[in-house]
Amino acid sequence: MRKATIFLLLSLLTFAGCSINPVTGQREFVIMSTAQEIEMGKQNYAPMQQSQGGVYDVDPALTIYVQGVGQRVASQSGVSLPYEFVVLNNSVPNAWALPGGKIAINRGLLTEIESEAELAAVLGHEAVHAAARHSAKQQSRAMLMQVGVMGTAIAARDSDYGGLIVGGANVLAQAGLARYGRGAELESDYYGMQYMSKAGYDPQGAVALQETFVRLSEGRRTDWLSGLFASHPPSRERVNANVATASALPAGGLRGEREFQAAMRKTIEIKPAYEAYDEGRKALAEKNIEKALAQANQALTLFPDEAHFHALRGDIRLVEDKFDWAVTNYSRAIDRRDNFFYYHLQRGLAKKELGQADAAVVDLERSNELLPTAPAHYALGDIAKARGNLPDAIQHYKVVAKAGGEYGQAATTELVRLELPSNPGAYVNRACSADGNGNLVVSVRNESTVQVTGIQVAIQYNDASGRQQQKRFSVRGQLPPGQVASVNTGIGPYTAGSSCPAHVIAAQIAE
């Protein structure tokens, strides 16, 4: 019966989710509709750009050029999507596509390719990911796995492992869907070459591009390993497949070396400034402040109009606890580019350290408007707590707590600190059982992430004459996270499994 239930759930989803791949014409399992994909891409395009360095706006003509090449190639897909193309201010060589045709290419990848045909190959490849609904298929696979997990959890809920299966399967699902699979990459290569050929480009550009990627992957450059190769792993198989595809397509077509180099002229000229900036970021991460500042100053000397460079110097001053200098540098960054979350976030944090709470809130809220982050919400929680606005503080800390990581742990601790005195039962669970004599035993479990002390439980019960009584019992010592302590109340008789008359009425953090 349990297996039948799971099979029915999976069968219903599979039947409902079958659709025709608009690129290959094959029937595939996709639950998400095209309209949902478009909306997902629309909602996430701007936040993704923010999280990847923001728009590369120092050379608007380059963006216009890239958009033109992208639209020229995507128009050959035969799939009606609201395609958009953007260049991101990020030195990591990478490109990506969101559902619904929202595509981005990093400055760092543009500086590595050599022709318009190679650019067309990159953008055509990403256009296929969108047109062939590869992200939607991944989402559908995840949903199908979740149904299988749900069915297994239903089937195993009476076992000792019921609570473990869901979490473990979720981890496996996330790990399995971390990047496009081999089939999706080969499919995007093949149809991307069809698109670029129809658009008038030489398909040999795609062959040259993959040859370059394989060579760079063999050199194991860390920026490539963390960028394009993490999500689009190159291989000799892909090179050979591209050679075979190119041989079946019309020979010739536009290579566009001259056009590409003309469009890239300014970006190539200022590339040394970004290289100095990247070295400065690396030095700062390694806590080499002197080198970081020297590299930031070199970058600013070469190209003083880039806001990222001013923000780097602000970060250095922030690490040095020179908060007023940091504010000055972040303000210079904002003067040059006021629509990037990071500058507002960092200036808000610096102003908070200077005790300028009102000004800090303005910056932090502006940062969250552009891209909600854990540091911004955590700082806003701190400010609200200092002002005695506990509801707002709790709201911000709860947002951060869900994010996990270092900030999430700190926010969870703050939540316990704020809520434990007034709502101890939210963090300390109680359970009732009977000892061998039928007397009530109350067990308490610390569900928080911090050590707790001063736990008190109240027992409401009727005595032999039927009068309602209340007694309080204290749990001795400190209770670490996840640990259980028990108190034998001596009150009885208590029937195991009946309503638990105990309530946790007090607890505090063990400082």
Language-model-detected regions and their locations in the chain:
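Register position in tetratricopeptide repeats
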Residues: 285, 319-320, 353-354, 386-387, ...
